[in-house]
Amino acid sequence: MHYFHVKNFIKISLLILLNSYSLSQGFWGKEFPEGKIKYSPRKYICYKAKNVVILDGKINEKAWENVPWTDSFVDIEGNLKPDPYYDTKVKMLWDENYFYFAALLEEPHVWATITERDEVIFKDNDFEIFLDPDGDTHNYYELEVNALETEWDLFFLKPYHDDEKVVLDSWDIPGLITKVHVDGTINDPTNIDKNWSVEIAIPWNTFISNYRSYTFPY
């Protein structure tokens, strides 16, 4: 996320943190090889919510009605990899208290096994968010959620390539709300599911201690 626009919307660059991406110039005295893919993050205009966002995982309330979806997700390596078999896309909103995400993930067999918070959620199929409020690749946030509504939230002091000990795994997002809805049955291989969806509300206060300008959309 690059910056907030103070009026009724914020313009967000969806920053995908790529470990295959690197700078062609020296970075703090280190040299990195040329990246395999062009670094050009897609952008999304995130509007202020006009109605109350009801957090139940279903994405069918009035607040989301006219909110555009992002483009369908692709592999982290872009055109170097084939398109995913199943569609994933997201909507976003904000109000005075929260930054909202609504994700829809196609999956014919919705499956999840991890139930303990801060376990390695990506061993299940999951939805992940990376937030870097000031765009400097340091002091950024990661959140992962699986279809059982299990959360894994982390705080990164710096990029992985800077140091071995860069993650605060014990850190939790205060006031985080996540709600999942499964259109089908979870962990049942005998039938075909349609998708699962997740609604997430991240309080703006989460960013206060690490966001330099303390400028929020309101």
Residue ranges and their predicted role:
Residues H5-L15:
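Sec-dependent signal peptide recognition
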Residues L14-S24:
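Hydrophobic h-region of N-terminal signal peptides that target proteins for export
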